[in-house]
Amino acid sequence: MSTSTALHLMDEQDPAPTTIQNTEESLVRVQPALLKILQSAGAKGDMFTLKQVMHYLGQYIMVKGLYDKQHQHIVHCGSDELGKLLGITTFSVKDPRPLYDMLKKNLLRISCTDAGHSPSRNKSQASDSLELEKSFASKTEVTDVIKRNDCVSSDMCTSFDNSHLKGNESSDYTKQSLDFIFEEWDEAGLPWWFLGNLRTNYNLQSIGSTDIPSNQDIDTATVSDTTDDMWFLNDSRTDRINMEVKMESSDSLEEEVGECDSKKPAQMIELTLYEDDDDLDDTQSLSEDTDTEVTSEECWQCTKCHKFNSPVKRYCYRCWALRKDWYLDFPRLIHSSSTPTLPGKVSSQMIVDGLDIPDCRRTVSAPMVGVQVPECRSLVPFLEPLDLAANSKAFSESTDTLLTFKAAEASLLSSRPLLEPCQLCQRRQRNGSVVHGRTAHLVTCFSCACNLKKNQKGCPVCEKPIQMVVKIYVA
């Protein structure tokens, strides 16, 4: 029984894998330069199928450690025999066109006549034929099918040889340049031999019995022993963070306790956050713990819980304690040395006698701390006024400064409720202003405010629809 008869018998029993078997069992002969590389990866013989060549190339790259340890889809082959064969120093598995060009030059398609005369092929054919004869000798129907298929196979081989041996009749077989189309791609653009779709390791002692799986379910890529074939897939993928957020305030929860029995249970909103998603770049750049510009030396340590906080934060992120030596902890402004103290004699003299214009330059005057006298006054000494006028002007300026500081301090004290923790999470600072129309409410942190807007919730205070969320920086 010939090999073509055995193949046709398999076609009759299982029509589905016919196309796969025919395409994958087309043999190619490897040139000596590429054959040396394949044999170093464990290949035996000089005729292989296309998938076997691809498999041993992947094994060679893995065993030699030619792939980049950080970006494992990149192969560095500059100082290796593979690089000399390719003519390049590096290539990417995601774009293996240089590798395919090299295969087209170093693989020759083998005709049916040449494949039938291969020694290793004859051994596998003999063993396969013996097994098939033992299995199906008792079935007359199968015998008829074998005869018919044998005739068809011999006709196909004869027509194949006649069509390709017209140009060179003296040669026993024709070596054709490999002109195949690589369609072994998955949706990600990676070749199948790097995805590890081969279920078993190859044993080329019997090429005919090599079990080459189909590549129909390429999306699932279910394999049994592909640890070595998937060396480049160890790259870190985009991390996904699943969290459940229930945007309900404490007051609304108490009101809805009695209604939970009659209504359906509260819906939990599941959020999936992608770290590399472009839509969340602005949110993550404004988060509290991802300030990349602040170094560890600039952070301040809380005196209560010893947590390091950002220098722009006035409260501890963990225990909400006010930062030590913050400007509110400084003592109130006292009378400085620049504030003049008017002696009683001068004031009484001013009341009784009015302005005293001396007839000579005074040698001793009232305190003039912080008041600069113009130099032009020395040019007209006889018109110099009493120092009391300058002192009264400085006193009025210092009084205005004190009043301004007290007003600012009062405004800070009145805005202290705004510095309380977030109304929803009770943990972060209130820095997310919820804007609706021409008004806004500052009762939540920026993260909770963004979650409210994404889930189309209303304002926690007035239940108005949220138009935008603005982050507030309190300095």
Curated annotation (Swiss-Prot):
Gene Ontology terms: biological process: negative regulation of apoptotic process; positive regulation of mitotic cell cycle; protein ubiquitination; regulation of gene expression; ubiquitin-dependent protein catabolic process
Stretches annotated zinc finger (RING-type): 422-463
Gene Ontology cellular component terms for the protein in this record: nucleus
RanBP2-type zinc-finger residues: 296-325
GO molecular function: p53 binding; ubiquitin protein ligase activity; zinc ion binding
Record keyword Zinc present: yes
Keywords, alphabetical: Metal-binding, Nucleus, Zinc, Zinc-finger
Domain SWIB/MDM2: 26-109
Short motif (Nuclear localization signal): ranges: 427-430
Signal peptide: none
Record localization: Nucleus
Matches recorded under InterPro entries: MDM4 (IPR015458), p53_neg-reg_MDM_2/4 (IPR016495), SWIB_MDM2_dom_sf (IPR036885), SWIB_MDM2_domain (IPR003121), Znf_RanBP2 (IPR001876), Znf_RanBP2_sf (IPR036443), Znf_RING/FYVE/PHD (IPR013083)
Lineage top rank: taxon: Eukaryota
Function: Inhibits p53- and p73-mediated cell cycle arrest and apoptosis by binding its transcriptional activation domain.
Subunit: Binds to p53 and p73.
Family, as annotated: Belongs to the MDM2/MDM4 family.
Protein known as: Protein Mdm4
Organism for this UniProt entry: Xenopus laevis
